[in-house]
Swiss-Prot record:
Signal peptide: none annotated. Residues 1-27 are annotated as: Disordered. This is Peroxiredoxin Q, chloroplastic. The gene is PRXQ. It catalyses: a hydroperoxide + [thioredoxin]-dithiol = an alcohol + [thioredoxin]-disulfide + H2O. It comes from Suaeda salsa (Seepweed). It comes from the Eukaryota. InterPro entries: AhpC/TSA, Peroxiredoxin_BCP/PrxQ, Thioredoxin-like_sf, Thioredoxin_domain. Residues 1-64 form a transit peptide.
Length: 214
């Protein structure tokens, strides 16, 4: 009987080549204070080569505010816009609004500062003082205060020590200093903590509403 011989070849399968598609996401790039950005020194861009770092999903959960409602915040002494030392204890005996903001002369921060200015008489009527804190130096604060006729105190937290002591959370994966406001009662106890980075004027609405409810 005749036998049939087949070539000894293993079957070959061709797989289509796959090129990973680039992840479509917005990149972060740092801009100067003078640029027109609502994000106070941070701009979102499709063209920048600087990509945001990849953080684990638990990143936000890992930030625990050190100062919460019902607590006594850490004391501090900082220089004001005139280079004079100002202590938090100076304001004890009356309600005080302490708002942390990213930087002077940035669009969102200027809008917030001017909103506090425009409502300052309402804060005074409620018996409260207003203090703004950022990492800018005293000379920057002085120019900022004079330019926009701000009637309240600005304090310089160079090195962001007080910001860290109070546990003010950052935004945009740590690239942007947080915008957080605290209301302390006459005994120095925190009664309200409000955080809203991209709606700066809401800080004024929420703190006034709270003060007027006391």
């Amino acid at each position: 009987m005749a036998t049939l011989s087949l070539p000894n070849h293993s079957p070959t399968f061709a797989l289509p080549s796959q090129t990973p598609k680039p992840h479509s996401s917005q990149n972060l790039s740092i801009i100067s204070k003078s640029a027109h950005s609502q994000f106070c020194g941070i701009k979102l861009s499709h063209s920048s080569s600087l990509s945001p770092p990849l953080y684990p999903r638990s990143y936000k959960a890992s930030i625990v505010a050190k100062v919460s409602e019902g607590s006594m915040p850490p004391a501090f002494t900082l220089k004001d816009q005139d280079g004079k030392n100002v202590s938090l204890s100076k304001f004890k005996g009356k309600p005080v609004v302490v708002y942390f903001y990213p930087a002077d002369e940035t669009p969102g921060c200027t809008k917030q500062a001017c909103a506090f200015r425009d409502s300052y008489e309402k804060f005074k009527k409620a018996g409260a003082e207003v203090i703004g804190i950022s990492g800018d130096d005293s000379s920057s604060h002085k120019a900022f205060k004079q330019k926009y006729k701000l009637p309240y105190t600005l304090l310089s937290d160079e090195g962001n020590k007080v910001r860290k002591d109070w546990g003010v959370p950052s935004d945009l994966f740590g690239a942007l200093p947080g915008r957080q406001t605290y209301v302390l009662d006459r005994n120095g106890v925190v009664r309200l903590v409000y955080n809203n980075q991209f709606q700066p004027e809401k800080h004024i609405d929420e703190t006034l509403k709270f003060l007027q409810s006391l």
